[in-house]
Structures are given as C-alpha cells and as structure tokens.
Regions:
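Short, structured segments at the rim of ligand-binding sites
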Residues: 1-394
Length: 394
C-alpha cells in the first residue's frame, strides 16, 4: 500500500508468502502498480498511476477489502471489489459511508458489504470525516494509509465504542511516519495526516508473530519447549502479547538474542484477560483455556463476530461439540474446563480456527480438522511446519 503511493521504487525484504499477501499484490497490480515477486525473499515495487477498469479479488483478506478501496478513490475509472462467500458477510458499511462522505463514488446496491465498485476521478479532496471503527481498526488504517494522497490530507474522527486491536493502528501510524508522512495522533480518537508524497525505500518485514501462537502453545500443552527465532526485541505487533498471555497460562517465557522460547510446566491455568488489543489470538488462547485446570474469561472481543467467521459462535460450537463448556456473550467467552473427546472440528474456512483445532488435538485424541488448507491465508506451510514440530513429517 505505502510503496504503491510513493515516489520511486521500493523493496520488501522477507515478505509473508501467503494468500492474503498474494491477493494484495494482485489487487495493486490490477490497479496498475508494477510488482515483481519472482524472488520470495525480496519483492520490488514500482508505483504507476492507478486506473480502472479493474477487478480486485479480496478473498477473505480484511486488509485487501478495507485498505484498497480508499486508494481506489485516487485512481481513474471503476475498480470492482469482491471476495469469498464469507467475505461478503464481513462489515464494510462504515468505511464505504466514510468514502462517500469524502466525495468518492461508491456503488454497493445498499449492501454495505462486498461486492461494490469504487469509481475514482484521479483525486480525492480529503478534509475531515467521522467513522465508527468499533467493528474493526482496519477501517481507520485503510483511510490513514491513503490519506497522504488526498489533496487536503485527512482528519479522521472515531465516534463509537472503543476501537479494537489498537496495536494495529499504532503500527499503521509508525509505518506512515517511516515512509515520510506527517501524522498527528496526539488527540484521543482523532488522527490527522498531512498531504504529501511518500518516499520509496527498503522495508524489512517483521515475522508475523500471531502465526507463532499455535507453535508456542504446543509447548504449554505438551510440557515441552519451543523457540521461535527472529522474535523482535521491540515491536508494535499484537502478537507480542503472547509473551504475557502464555506466562499467565503457566508457561516459562524467555526473550533473548536467539528468539522467544516458551517452556511448558505440565500445567495450564485459567485466566481472566481483556483481548481487545489482540483479538486474533483468541482462538488459540481459547483452545488452551479449554485444556486448563480452572475457568477462564476472555473479554473485549465482541468484534470477533465480524471476522473471517463469527469466531465467538464458532469457538463455542466447536469446543462444546468436543465436550467442552463454553458460553459466548456480547463481550467474549466464558470457558469452564471439561474432559474433551475426539470429533470433527469445523474450521469455517478460518485459519485461526484451524490453529485452535490443532492445539486441542495435541491433548485430545481423534480431533479432525475439517479444512487445514485454510491456513494458507497467512501460513501456507502450516501443515508441514506442524508435522515437523511433532516429528511426524515423512
């Protein structure tokens, strides 16, 4: 996103090779950006004027469906967005209303969801806009990432319940500043981005820490030790909260030059925790809580009902289907440990649900994932990596 709106070429070192990344690349290419991904270790990006007609396949990627439409407003011509069946159920209305308020033409037949078409005129005036981003921080990030391209920049005000996953917003602001944007986030729930062209540069991509959750969780379940190399000593990623969470759950967690190491103690303890800043960790944490020695409460995650699937309902149904005792309410989950049994664990085409099922399967014989291939969304090698971890790869 940032490189497509920059002056000059950019490079991405150590990019995440996954379906979500491929969809973002394809979407930008469809709009005119030149991207060379022939080297998995180093992608090269050269910006060009954006134009339609074009069609963007969002798959199930919230980043694609929420980051690219604000940029499409600066293109010339129609850009049509669509995605997987589950993606058509994900909330989009607040972002589409914000774009309309900024003068961008959006045609969604009143759905407030995929599919829709953004018809750009080559420029967006910008100015001020108010949005309720309580369903997803991605609405705000999408607007902020394109704001430097708008003639007057952008002042975005959030009005509504608290924005979830705030570390993602901090990451957005940090990266905008690194790219040369002037961003003022000193006022609560207000972000101001000055207009101006960003500068192409080399980006070193951090490892996706949230994808480490099931592997580190394996140490807690089995009483073993797992090390994830390359864990950054300083990061704004929500996945870094795993260090504190897994300590509370009963693990011994050490961060050093060799990476992050989690050692299991043979015991899992229930927790009472607010996961509003890292809702993506909920499925794996819920799986661990279902195996713990005392009840758990996971709070601040009502927004997960609008993720790849309704994760609160999905976790409740699937864990209870294995004999668990899980209750979902408006804000989160209440989990009371019970002796679990084997059975089919439906992933709902959701990569995080598949990770949760794999964790449960470490402690419960006969757990069958309905669709492990859905992990390709963010980690295509998950099945092989999991087999390697367990020493089961042929």
């Amino acid at each position: 996103m940032l490189t497509a709106a920059s002056i000059g070429a950019s490079s991405l070192a150590a990019p995440l090779i996954a379906r979500d990344s491929a969809l973002m690349v394809a979407g930008l290419q469809a709009m005119g950006t030149l991207i060379n991904t022939s080297d998995d270790a180093l992608w090269m990006i050269r910006p060009r004027p954006l134009a339609g007609p074009a069609t963007v396949d969002c798959g199930l990627a919230g980043t694609v469906m929420r980051f690219l439409p604000p940029l499409a407003g600066t293109a010339t011509g129609p850009i049509t967005f669509d995605g997987d069946d589950y993606a058509r159920q994900r909330p989009m209305a607040p972002l589409l209303r914000a774009l309309t308020a900024l003068g961008v033409r959006v045609d969604d037949a009143g759905r407030g969801a995929l599919p829709f078409t953004v018809t750009g005129t080559g420029r967006v005036t910008g100015g001020e806009v108010t949005i309720d981003s309580s369903a997803s921080s991605q609405f705000l990030s999408g607007l902020l990432l394109s704001a430097p391209e708008y003639d007057r920049g952008l002042v975005v005000r959030h009005e509504g319940p608290p924005v979830p996953s705030s570390p993602h917003l901090r990451m957005t602001v940090d990266m905008l500043r690194t790219a040369g944007a002037a961003v003022d986030d000193s006022r609560p729930d207000v972000w101001e981005v000055e207009p101006g062209r960003l500068t192409g540069r080399g980006w070193q991509i951090e490892p996706d820490l949230s994808n480490a959750a099931p592997f580190l969780a394996a140490a807690l379940v089995t009483g073993g030790t797992v090390t994830v190399p390359g864990w950054p000593l300083r990061t704004s990623q929500p996945g870094d909260l795993l260090r504190g969470l897994f300590t509370e759950l009963g693990g011994r967690v050490t961060l050093g030059p060799d990476g992050l190491t989690v050692a299991g103690t043979g015991m899992l303890h229930g927790i009472d925790v607010d996961l509003s800043e890292a809702g993506e960790l909920t499925p794996v944490v819920a799986a661990l809580c279902a195996l713990a020695d005392s009840p758990s409460t996971l709070r601040g995650i009502g927004h997960l009902r609008g993720h790849e699937t309704d994760r609160l309902a999905a976790l409740t149904d699937q864990l209870n289907g294995l004999g668990g005792d899980v209750t979902a309410d408006e804000d989160g989950l209440r989990i009371r440990p019970r002796r679990l049994r084997g059975g089919v664990f439906d992933t709902y085409a959701d990569h995080r649900m598949a990770q949760a099922a794999a964790v449960v399967g470490l402690a419960v014989a006969g757990v069958e994932l309905s669709d492990v291939a859905c992990t390709s969304k963010t980690l295509p090698r998950f099945p092989l990596m999991w087999a390697d971890l367990l020493g089961e790869r042929p």
